[in-house]
Amino acid sequence: MKLKPFLSLLAFLVVSIAGAQTLKGKVIDDQNEPLLGVTILVKEVPNKGATTNEKGEFSINVNTNQTLVFSYIGFQSKEIKVGKQKNLVVTLIGEAEELPELLVVGSRAGGRTKIDSPVPVDVFDVAKTSKTQPQVNLNQILNSIAPSFTSTTQVVSDGSDHLDPAQLRGLGPDQTLVLLNGKRRHTSAFINVNGTPGRGTVGTDLNTIPSFALSKIEVLRDGASAQYGSDAIAGVMNLELKKDKGLSAQVSYGGHLTPTANDHRGNFDGGQGQLDINYGTELGKKGGFLNFTFSAQFRDKTHRAGTFDGDIFNAYNAIERRALNHGDNLSRYFSNINVNADPRLLRLIKGYAGEVDYFDSSYLAQIQSANSIADLQPILKKDFTEQELAYRGLNRKDYNMHVGQSSLLGTQFFVNAAFPVSDNWEIYAFGGQSYRYGEAGGFFRRPNQARTFTGLYPNGYLPKITTDIQDSSISAGIRGEAGKWHLDLSNTFGRNEFAYTIKNTGNTSLRFASPDYFDAGKLRFAQNTINLDLSRPIELFHKSNISFGVEQRHESYSTVAGAENSYATYDITGGVLPLSAPASQKVTDFFGNALPGGAQVLPGFREESALTKTRNVWAGYGEFETDITQWLLANAAVRYEHYSDFGNTFNYKLATRVKLFPHVNLRAAASTGFRAPSIHQLYYTNINTLQINGVLQETGTFNNISRAAELFGIEKLQEEKSKSLSTGFAVKIPKAGLSLSADAYFIRVDDRIILTEAFTRPAGNSPAENELKQIFDQANVSTVQFFSNAVDVETKGIDVVVSHSLQADKFTLNNDFAFNLTQTRKVGDIHTPRAIKAAGLEEKFFSERSRVLLEEVIPRFKATLSHNLTIGKWNGYLRNTYYGKATGPDVIAADKRIGDFVFDERGHQVIRGKVITDLSVAYNFTPKTSLTLGVNNLFDLYPEKNVKVNNNNDQFVYSRATSQFGLNGRYVFLRATFNVF
């Protein structure tokens, strides 16, 4: 990054400050009582404003030609032209209507409310609802209150257990742009390669930002690439940090009280607690502010497996246990059973077999008659699970996987500040640091599996994936007016690191020398963005505004290798196994199966996968918005971007709003958009242990510049290109306290990037196939997968939002209803490379499972109905959310029923929709202290169970591949809120 030009321009702007004035005043109600927390915004300047203190007083820097907008919940908003006034006393009149929120997203002109916006924008007052909301992190909050938003906690999905993929309008997590205070937020370093929603994508980790630091969230439900750049195909989410003054705190504790807790043994699990503190103060005497938020939280695991009903122990395991009782470890008598077994081993096995009291005489006779280890091997594979469990004092639930939310421990610290350097200019800064430690489980390694070295783990083990996620960001800039121009120059830096440590596991090829934890490496992503935005009103038609700007973005992506023992396979001498090593050098179990290398559950990043890649992006954009008349608004935006790694893109957007009546608007928009392949998708390479057709396999994800991709004919990634259309209307009836909006949309995305299914090791002997075999063997994988611009998709749907507010003498009632109906479909032919098509592998390139993950694993229909009632010191909140049906990705039974289970015409299990009820009651002991008791999922509902053939021996009782409302059941919580001063 070249900081010198940026700092020079910053200094130039500071010393080129235009003269203006400081306006002071007071806001009161119609009873002459001061109003605390009134929002005061400069209509012409997005993000510039102030709030009143406990005396109703405020101070703000403005120009004489600007307009102030005063707004407060339960009162009519008021606009006042500044002129030459130095002091103001503003009286707000109460009215039963919704607070008019001035939007940051959707238009650079500023000063628009969501009812007057030419595109649909939802505004969620996080600060207002934090007292009564059951949810505490952003993903959970948005999943509950925003029908077009979907995100649930993932289970047994490697890193996805620690980062919840989030989707808007059914599109990918990487097709929604996230802003913080109007500035582009960096994405996570993690890329989801498991078989869960959002597979193959990179999203923004919303949970690095504490919800207590936010005043509101704006969700722009429309394509906006022409305004904001890459990723804004589905829309834009803008998170606004608090500017409050004073000290407030919140303490929450809750957990899951449900009969399914603790693997269906009941009681309570998944306890979680959170402490939030926010402090704000004035900065200077001209309306500056400084606001801090600290948040700390812990979350325990939930356990939702059933009872493992598969095989666990065979006869060899039983004999091995009896030998261990005598201090004799049978694994010490061989390292490769086929070449170096100690001659004593046969005699020892026969001897200890006699101590297994449940072996009948006939079976013992078979063992005693064996003349070699080869004779014993088929005999000792016999299952004796029930008998051996009883002998060892274990039960089947001891072999359950950890199926449920991961545990975590985290902290966040965020700051938001602005300081006027004159009456007309201010410098600002915001950002934060967060840390999150998480622990999740993988697939259980049972004693009768080759993946388990029973010399160290005679009872098997449950490996754990732990992550250390560190995230930091800082944005700083200067903004103000130079004449009629509003300028905003900023620099935003963000960095995310995702580090893996694998615990309670082993590298089986190391046998007795294996540690039980491994440094598996880390992923890093950093992004630096420099923006210069300019806008000004112009005298054209009724009212017009022109905006333009430039942006330079630098991105860096790194893979850091893990320790050698986290990924290497070792031979019988303890050295790294050469690629050309004969079978006689490989470490085996008793039955002759080669013991796999690398940390079980998740091998580390290999040395040859380590890399650091960078790219630069340059952009220029312009936007023109005009009220042609008082009833007709038009907006046009264009954007050009150049990427150093794949080329150029040009996009546009047109939008209009027609005011039929003072509070009745029609709106429509058309745009093109794009999403550049993330730098992660371009260069990520790693090996994961995935379940494929019910079998655990090491699967390599190879990037598109690899030799393997070239041999398979996988083409280099290009940008996704989109076209969007939307139309709708917005109606507001102030005297009835009612507002309504409905919007229909259509989005086509060409060249959607997906992660292919896994290709198996070639069996032929052509030169290309022989080379691929070497690549497979060198990476120690049995299957490989790639990223590819594989398909074109179309998404269409409708959003409806209805809000009603009723204020009476003794109570206030707010009602909100919203629903989203959406459908995503693959259209046209699959973009299959010639080599793959010629080999008949098109189903592996984009499978039926891939189609369902793209189209149907999240609900197509979602609706919420909420009520918020305040009576005196009491506040009650009731919300019902309907999560529509979803479809499991696995093909099981075509178009029929199996008991209570329903399947569609293609054989996928249908997960039917359900209504989830949330209820909370709060009591305000004083104006500054309240206590809330609440229940999320009041009636303890769960998704439909997996059909038996698809529940992995009763481990995945509920699908882990679909995303409705999670699988944790009823959640109860208690929350105390304090406004100290």
Language-model features and meaning:
Residues 241-263, 379-390, 398-399, 404, ...:
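Surface-exposed extracellular loop regions of Gram-negative outer-membrane beta-barrel proteins
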Residues 457, 461-476, 480-481, 493, ...:
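Outer-membrane beta-barrel transmembrane domain signature of Gram-negative proteins
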Residues 59, 139-189:
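Extracytoplasmic beta-strand/coil segments of soluble accessory domains associated
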Residues 90-91, 185, 199-250:
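A beta-strand signature from Gram-negative outer-membrane beta-barrel systems
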